[in-house]
């Protein structure tokens, strides 16, 4: 079930209705996939525990791979670093806070966001605290760092630029948010000297990394309907920037391709969703709100194929690795899809806990984090 957040009392009735419908809806009917084999062969290089795992599906706790290390965090405040090749634990620290987002890694820092609005920067070498900066509300988006500027987004929609050395605030981008939004935030994407942010009002904005000034802003989806619930068009999925084009998808709205140079829409499709996207040289892959996986021509948005057999499962965003397409799900499976025709070529299970965040690819290795905090490094085994 998608979690929602209220900005004021006007949304109380709508929120109560959503919760009532969810409670009365009963168990979902899961698809029968018993005929699907194991698919793409993988070998487990190593496994480890991050600690307690994630306390909420709204939390953006996802592994980060940087400089031959893997970093991960749990809700209870622990942040850990492992050697990416061997799985040897290099350090672990307890921040003493309930963590909800991260880590982001780069520039010698490991960045995590907390429920109380604190952004923590740790030394990537040993986990020692470098600095702490207070934002305006809980942090549910993965912090980013580029050119010694940390970019973080708070749950109330504000985007911050902070000095990577000290945590001092350099700029803030502040936009009002709708009365009712999904709980959680899309993470900002940094490309060169630009920051791309999907906003809760259905608009995609690009900011200057150095000063936070708006370069362009483009509507992806326009709110429609009479109630606050009907008008929700959060850009909840992380934006994807690929070869000069930004892709964004709205909850209860559209999927759009926008040129990074001028902010003009290239094409738009009525494919609502909130999970995420991936791309390769030819196609864009996206999951819609019915857990159907689409492959679209990146140039014009035309449908190449659609895979419907995973309907009923809660899926992660798709990931492209080694010429393969893979999505994880709530049952602990990796679902392997043929990029050329969309066939479901295999499923393999990695525990019985939900996998709520997409696997993280690095070369021919996937890093997989389950909701209970089990971290696994899997290598593709080619025939």
Swiss-Prot record:
Keyword entries, A-Z: Cell outer membrane, Lipoprotein, Membrane, Palmitate, Signal
Lipidation (S-diacylglycerol cysteine): 24
The protein's name in its UniProt record: Outer membrane protein assembly factor BamB
The keyword Lipid biosynthesis is annotated on this UniProt entry: no
GO biological process: Gram-negative-bacterium-type cell outer membrane assembly; protein insertion into membrane
Subunit structure: Part of the Bam complex.
SMART domains on file: PQQ
Organism: Alkalilimnicola ehrlichii (strain ATCC BAA-1101 / DSM 17681 / MLHE-1)
Keyword check for Transmembrane: no
Function statement: Part of the outer membrane protein assembly complex, which is involved in assembly and insertion of beta-barrel proteins into the outer membrane.
Membrane-spanning segments: none
Primary residence: membrane
Subcellular location: Cell outer membrane
Signal peptide positions on this chain: 1-23
Lipidation residue positions, type N-palmitoyl cysteine: 24
Membrane topology: Lipid-anchor
Similarity section: Belongs to the BamB family.
């Amino acid at each position: 079930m998608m979690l929602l957040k209220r900005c004021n009392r006007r949304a109380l009735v709508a929120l109560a209705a959503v919760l009532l419908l969810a409670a009365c809806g009963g168990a979902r009917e899961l698809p029968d996939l018993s005929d699907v084999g194991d698919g793409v062969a993988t070998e487990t290089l190593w496994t480890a525990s991050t600690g307690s795992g994630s306390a909420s599906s709204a939390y953006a706790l996802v592994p980060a791979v940087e400089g031959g290390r893997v970093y991960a965090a749990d809700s209870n405040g622990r942040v850990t670093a492992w050697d990416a090749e061997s799985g040897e634990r290099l350090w672990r620290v307890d921040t003493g806070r309930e963590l909800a987002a991260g880590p982001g890694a780069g520039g010698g820092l490991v960045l995590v966001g907390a429920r109380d609005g604190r952004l923590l920067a740790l030394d990537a070498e040993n986990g020692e605290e470098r600095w702490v900066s207070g934002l305006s509300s809980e942090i549910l988006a993965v912090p980013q760092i580029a050119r010694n500027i940390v970019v973080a987004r708070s749950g109330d929609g504000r985007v911050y630029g902070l000095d990577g050395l000290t945590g001092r605030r350099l700029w803030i981008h502040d936009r009002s948010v709708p009365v009712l939004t999904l709980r959680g935030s899309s993470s900002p994407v940094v490309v060169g000297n630009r920051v791309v942010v999907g906003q809760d009002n259905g608009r995609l904005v690009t900011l200057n990394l150095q000063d936070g000034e708006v370069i362009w802003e483009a509507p992806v989806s326009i709110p429609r309907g009479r109630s606050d619930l009907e008008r929700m068009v959060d850009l909840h999925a992380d934006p994807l920037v690929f070869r000069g084009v930004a892709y964004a998808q709205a909850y209860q709205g559209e999927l759009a391709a926008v040129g990074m140079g001028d902010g003009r829409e290239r094409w738009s499709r009525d494919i609502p969703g909130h999970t995420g996207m991936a791309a390769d040289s030819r196609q864009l892959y996206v999951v819609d709100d019915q857990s159907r996986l689409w492959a679209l021509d990146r140039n014009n948005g035309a449908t190449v194929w659609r895979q419907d057999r995973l309907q009923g499962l809660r899926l992660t965003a798709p990931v492209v690795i080694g010429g393969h397409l893979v999505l994880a799900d709530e049952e602990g499976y990796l679902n392997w899809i043929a990029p050329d025709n969309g066939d479901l070529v295999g499923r393999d299970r990695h525990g019985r806990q939900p996998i709520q965040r997409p696997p993280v690819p690095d070369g021919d290795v996937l890093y997989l984090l389950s909701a209970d905090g089990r971290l696994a490094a899997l290598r593709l085994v080619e025939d």
